[in-house]
């Protein structure tokens, strides 16, 4: 059972540019949410000051009490663990089905939706709030695995390092632009608009990713026989 490759009607240069644009899109999350703005916001809204002037950084999650930074680390750690455990199997299934682009879209939209969901972050309802962060982080890092899997399809091996470096550069500049815009909003208008930065990042991520989705080559394959999960393990075993 072979693949049929559908090449979008773009030049190779345009296809490579489309690939690099996912760095431009995804980089906004990696800088604004994981590094620059959200950690400060999270610490501010989960720290309370008592009437006597005492400061508490304790939060309640699923009935358990945690230090706010401790819970933050646990949630991010759990999201990375899910990506580490699930990505190899999902990659095998995607290769077997010829659906890398579908998986890339799914993780992208999951991450962008989680990012937008942070707008409604509520320290009194951390179960929902931290779920949004969890989904955003799984989407961000999970999508990069499928994004990188396109590299051998759009460029020869000798161009991979250069193309990856260019993609990283695009991601860096894109993330700086959205960070400056968000900081201009927060510092120029007011800190009460910080939450809007999370919506802007989610829309930026999902919006610019459309360039990548339109330009990547598509592989389609006849519907496979047998158990899909088992076939995913077989593909993974073959790679290993």
Where are these regions (language model features)?
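Juxtamembrane intracellular "pre-TM" segments in multi-pass secondary transporters
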Residues: 2-17, 218-240
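Helix-loop boundary and gating motifs at the non-cytosolic
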Residues: 6-80, 126-130
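A membrane-interface helix-boundary motif in multi-pass transporters
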Residues: 61-68, 183-203
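Conserved MFS/SLC helix-loop-helix module at the cytosolic interface between two early adjacent transmembrane helices
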Residues: 85-122
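Hydrophobic core of transmembrane alpha-helices in multi-pass small-molecule transporters
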Residues: 107-121, 125-143
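Cytoplasmic helix-loop-helix junction between adjacent transmembrane helices
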Residues: 132, 136-169
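Glycine-rich segments within core transmembrane alpha-helices of 12-TM secondary carriers
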Residues: 161-186
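C-terminal membrane-cytosol helix-exit motif in multi-pass small-molecule transporters
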Residues: 178-187, 202-221
